[in-house]
UniProtKB/Swiss-Prot annotation:
Keyword annotations of the record: Cytoplasm, DNA-binding, Transcription, Transcription regulation
Listed GO biological process terms: regulation of DNA-templated transcription
Domain of life according to the entry: Bacteria
GO molecular function, one term: DNA binding
This protein's name: Probable transcriptional regulatory protein MMAR_2098
GO cellular component: cytosol
Compartment(s) where it occurs, according to its Swiss-Prot or TrEMBL record: Cytoplasm
Family: Belongs to the TACO1 family.
Organism (species): Mycobacterium marinum (strain ATCC BAA-535 / M)
Length: 251
């Protein structure tokens, strides 16, 4: 049940990651606020909120910021925005499919920023449904290896509904149906295995292999999209081989 991950290809390692910390914090805070608004402010009774808080903590978001976001979302503190989730679809260079999830309080601004980022970087917007059919919504739990083998992880999560365990090199990701995400995460906890994040996302059913130049163009487009404060997540169906990734890392 191993194999090259199609999930993490938009998470290409870049030296600019520190410069993006502020944007990453803002995205994590939004997730907490929305989760608390939708499912209530008690993490014990709201698994989505629990996972959003855990991910923020793992990413070193200050506890004060986390708690204020939870309170805003739950209505315990004023100042919460009316966040709306909007999905956009498009194509990157080489026919790579792109799904863009925005979490915004201004639909017009989000649409404009996504369109500009796409067209300036060789991409094109697509009609609703023309790209999304290539993706399935899945639950994904990521965890550092820390001496664990794939069999160790599989033994912990198989009965909980896990579909696949992917070896990402330094870490594993466990794929499941979204409805089994909490069970998989809980199974890891019960086995004493620490995890980095647990969240729902999209996984492609068909992938597009690219060479170094193609990968560079796709990552450039993803970077441009993620520069927008309204863009929460970007998924693609690009397949970047280990050899191509190694070449990119040398640049």
């Amino acid at each position: 049940m191993s194999g090259h991950s199609k999930w993490a290809t938009t998470k290409h390692k870049k030296a600019v990651i520190d410069a993006r910390r502020g944007k990453m914090f803002a995205r994590l805070i939004k997730n907490i606020e929305v989760a608390a608004r939708v499912g209530g402010g008690d993490p014990a009774g709201n698994p989505t909120l629990y996972d959003a808080i855990q991910k923020a903590k793992k990413s070193s978001v200050p506890n004060e910021n986390i708690e204020r976001a939870r309170k805003r979302g739950a209505g315990e503190e004023a100042g919460g925005a009316d966040w709306q989730t909007i999905m956009y679809e498009g194509y990157a260079p080489n026919g790579v499919a792109v799904l863009i999830e925005c979490l915004t309080d201004n639909r017009n601004r989000a649409a404009s920023e996504v369109r500009v980022a796409m067209t300036r970087n060789g991409g094109a917007m697509a009609d609703p449904g023309s790209v999304s059919y290539l993706f399935s919504r899945k639950g994904v739990v990521t965890l550092e290896k820390n001496g664990l083998t794939e069999d160790d992880v599989l033994a912990a999560v198989l009965e909980a509904g896990a579909e696949d365990v992917n070896d990402l090199g330094d870490s594993f990701e466990v794929i499941s149906e979204p409805g089994e995400l909490v069970a998989v995460r809980s199974a890891l906890q019960d086995a004493g295995i620490d995890y980095e994040s647990a969240e729902a996302g999209f996984q492609s059913s068909v992938t597009v292999p690219v060479d170094v130049d193609g990968a560079r163009k796709v990552f450039k487009l993803v970077d441009a999209l993620e520069e927008s404060d309204d863009v929460q997540n970007v998924w693609t169906n690009v397949d970047v081989s280990d050899e191509v990734l190694a070449e990119l890392d040398e640049e």
